[in-house]
Amino acid sequence: MIYLVTGQQKLFENPNYKTISIEESLQLMKDCKALQYDSETSCKNFHLGNILCIQFGNKAKDFQIVIDCTTINILLYKDILETKLLIGHNLKFDISWLYNYGIIPRKVYDTMIVEQLLYMGFPRIPVYPDRYEKYNYDFPYKIVQSDKKGTYYELSFSLQALAQKYLDINIDKTVRGEIIWRGLDTSVVLYAAGDVTFLEDIMWKQVKACKEKECLVGAKLECDFVPVIAYLEWCGIKLDEKQWRAKMDKDKEALNKSLQALNNYAIKHPKLQKWVKQDLQGNLFSGYDTESKWTVDWQKKESIKVVKALGFNVSTISKQTNKESESIMEKVLSSQKGIDDTFLKLYFDYQGCYKICSSFGQGHLNIINPKTGRIHTTYWQIGTVTGRMSSGGTTDEDLAKFKKLPINDCKNLNFQQLPHDAVTRGCFVSEPNNLFVSCDYAAMEARAGAEVYNEKVLLDEFLYGSGDTHAAYAKVVFTEELKDVAVKDIKKIRPDLRNKVKSVEFEINKIFI
C-alpha cells in the first residue's frame, strides 16, 4: 500500500495512494527493524538545493510511505532515520542531504556498494548479448546502443541493472528528471514509492551471494563506511584563497622560466631550425625584431615531430584503441637516456610546471562553494578495480550554474593526488579555533601483501627496521642509485626514487588483492 504524508489539502481521494497523517506514518514504522529508504531532491549539490520528498518502504508490512518535505518538517522523522537499518541504493547521496538537518543515520545497507564489492575487479568491457548467454555471465548491465559496435551490455551498478538481474523487473526512471517542475503529482508519488519497493529483495539476494563468496564481513564494513564518506563530502575542506593565489603566481612564474629555457635550447639546436623563425624584413610601423622565435606550442601535436627530429622513439600502444600511436609523455621518453638528456630535463621540467598550473590553479577557486566557503569534491569508496578509494572525475553543474561559470570550469577535484610540497598543502587550512588531525594506516596493503607472500625483506623491515616499505622497494628497484643509502635514510636523501617506486609497489600488491 502506498501512503502520502503532505501538508497540502486534497479535494479528492486518489485511488493510487492514501493520504495519512504524520502520526499514522510514524506508527506504521515504529516496530520496523529495517526500512527501505530513498529521497528526491531539487538538484545534486546538497549545499545548494533542497529535499523535495523522502520515501520509506517495508516488505513485511507491505507499505511505501512518501513524505512531502516541502510541507512536512523532516526532523519529525529524525529518530526513525537514526535508529532503523536503512536499506538504500547509493545512500552516500541521500545521507549527505540529511546532514544538513543534523540527522545522522547509524545503520545502513547500500545495495550499490555491496554489488560493487561482489564484482570488484570485473572489467567494464563491451559484452554482446550472445556471448553473455553463451558464457553464463551474471553481472548487472546496462544496454548500450552504438553505431560502431551495435548493441552490447556494459557493467552497471544502477538500481535498474540490479532489479533486472536479481528480480527480472524493469524500473522506469523517466519521471526522475521531471520531479522539480511536476511537484508531487500522482506519477511522482508512484515513482518515489517504486524506488523503495524492491531494495529489500535485492539485499537478501546479495547477502546470499556474499555468503557464497565469503565476503559478508567485507560487505558490512563497506556499508558501515557509507555514512563516513558521505560526511567527508558534506564537510569539504577550506582553501585559503589568498595563499592559493600567491601560489598560482609563483607557479606561473616557474612555468614561464621553464618554457623560456626549453625554447632557448630548441632555438639553438641544429636539428630543430625548421621550427625557428626570424623576422629579418620588418616594417615601417613595428620596426625590426631579428631575435629568433620558437614557433611550436609544446602542448600541441606538432611537438611530436620536434621530439622525433631529436631522435626519440615516440611509438606506443594506445590503451583506448589498443593500436600503435605516438606519444611524448614522460613514461614513453624517460627510458630513452643518452639521446638528448639536456632536452629531456628541460622538457620534463616544463611539463611538470604546466601540469601544476593547469591542475592546481584556478579550478580550485572555481569549485569553492559560496554557501560553505569550502571545496566539496566527490569520493568513491570502491573507486578502482582493486577496491581502492578514488575522488573527483565529475562536474558540479549545479555549482557552475550558481556561480554563472561554464560547466566544465567546475570540475570536482582529485584530492588524493595533491602535490607533496608544503606550499600547496599549506593552502588547505582549518577553520578558526580548529586544528587539522591527520592520521593514516601505515602501508596497510604492503603489510598484508608481505604476510601473504611471506616476503622476508618486507617482514624484516616491518618487524625490525624503519617500517618504510616504499623505501624498501626503492632499495630493491634502484640498486645502483641507493647502494650506499640505508633504507631508513632514503626518504630524506632520495625522496624522488621513493615516490617513483610506489607504482611498482601498488601494482604488485594489486595482484594479491
Predicted regions and their residues:
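Active-site-proximal helix-loop-helix substrate-binding element of RNase H-like nuclease domains
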Residues: 2-17, 45, 49-210, 221, ...
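Short secondary-structure boundary/capping segments
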Residues: 50-53, 102-105, 123-126, 393-411, ...
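Cytochrome P450 catalytic domain signature, combining two hallmark sequence patches
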Residues: 106-107, 123-126, 256, 313-318, ...
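Hydrophobic helix-and-loop "lid/oligomerization" segment in the mid-to-C-terminal part
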Residues: 511-512
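Conserved "right-hand" nucleotidyltransferase catalytic core of DNA-directed polymerases
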Residues: 1-48, 63, 133-154, 181-423, ...
